[in-house]
Each structure stands twice: as C-alpha cells, then as structure tokens.
C-alpha cells in the first residue's frame, strides 16, 4: 500500500434499477457506476460486483466520488416482502411501450418528482414519449384502493389489473412499466395464470412453491 484515499460521500435509498453502467436510487436519480465498482457485504465478508445489488430494497450504502458510484457497503440482510415485475406488451413480445394507458376505479395518486396529483375514479391517464411528467424522471401510480388497470395490454383474461404500485419510466427505446407488489399478492395472480384453478389442490400448492422460489431467485 502506497497511499489511501478516503471517500466519505454516501448515498442511501431504495434501488429502482441497476445495470452494468449505472444504478438508479430513489430520491437521488440515476448515477453512473465506476468501472472498478465493488460491493462489500458485511454479513458474510464477501466482495462482489454490481450484479449483487438487489433491486427494490435499500440494503446498502453507496460511496460516491467525482459523480460516480465507486463502491457500496451492504449492511442490511434481505427480508424479501415485495417483488418488482416488468410488465410486457401483449403477447409478451417486448418490454417497451409506445404508449401506456392506466385507469383505476377508485382513482389514483400520480407522483412525479416532488409533485403529486390525484385522478378521479375511473379517469384514464395516458403516457407517451412526449409526456412532460417524464421530465421529472420516473412516474409512480398509487391506487387509492383496489388495483390499477393497464389498458395498453391485452391478456388471455382481458385487460389486466395490478395491485401495489405502478412505475412508468421513459427510455430511448420506449416506455417501461414496473409493478411493485407484495410477494403473496403476486403469487395470487401468477399461479392461476400458469395452471387452471380446477387442478388438484396439492398440484396448486406445488406450483405456488415453485413460483415463490423462482421469484426469490430472480
């Protein structure tokens, strides 16, 4: 060791997305990852890379220097209560939408940056690449009660609806929609979509276990 540089700027918050090049942190935005980024896990003294960052949780403190995240310290254990699921287009062909249309029978709270507004019950909200709300970054939709219908998608059961919250983001390729929901509520939706409810109860239980295990792994 010929020298030590102390880096004291720390950013903490729920991770909304991560890639090889950047990490998006709630309340802070997207920050570039240093090419030599490493993460130290205090619980088991492991050193890992960006692929070990868990999206949807605030488990680590990110060390920032010169506008880039150069490292992170994971100091909290994972207690997986929620799951974040990217919603695909009709036919599950793509993750990018040209337009995203939502509606909630109870109305919604729409959060854009530091601002928010409410929609009336049954009111439709439309997002496209020209929507000015995207200037504030990621948009969050919260139903006042019940679920939110995603009218831009058609499934075998018709127009799908989602509990929890919906996040809408604009990328160069199009609009990406993410549903954050409790694990158990997610399983209530995914298991019936994977096998008929008329199947034997034990078979349904096995499918629920498989779906839960897959969700935790992902």
Task: Give the location of each predicted region.
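Conserved, single-site charged/polar hotspot
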Residues: 1-218
């Amino acid at each position: 060791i010929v020298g030590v540089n102390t880096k004291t700027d720390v950013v903490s918050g729920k991770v909304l997305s991560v890639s090889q090049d950047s990490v998006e942190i709630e309340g802070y935005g997207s920050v570039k990852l240093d090419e030599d980024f490493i993460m130290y896990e205090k619980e088991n003294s492991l050193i890992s890379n960006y692929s070990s960052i868990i999206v949807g949780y605030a488990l680590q403190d990110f060390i920032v220097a010169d506008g880039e995240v150069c490292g992170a310290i994971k100091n909290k254990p994972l207690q997986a209560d929620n799951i974040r699921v990217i919603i695909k287009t009709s036919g599950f062909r793509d993750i990018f939408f040209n337009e995203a249309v939502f509606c909630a029978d109870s109305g919604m709270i729409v959060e854009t940056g530091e601002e928010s507004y409410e929609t009336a019950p049954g009111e439709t909200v439309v997002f496209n690449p020209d929507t000015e709300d995207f200037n504030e970054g990621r948009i969050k939709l919260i139903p006042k009660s019940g679920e939110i219908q995603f009218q831009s998608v058609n499934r075998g059961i018709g127009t799908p609806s989602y509990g929890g919250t919906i996040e809408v983001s604009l990328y160069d390729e199009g609009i990406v929609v993410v549903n954050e929901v409790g694990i158990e509520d997610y399983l209530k939706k995914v298991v019936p979509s994977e096998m008929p409810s008329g199947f034997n109860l034990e078979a349904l239980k096995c499918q629920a276990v498989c779906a839960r295990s897959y969700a935790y792994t992902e």
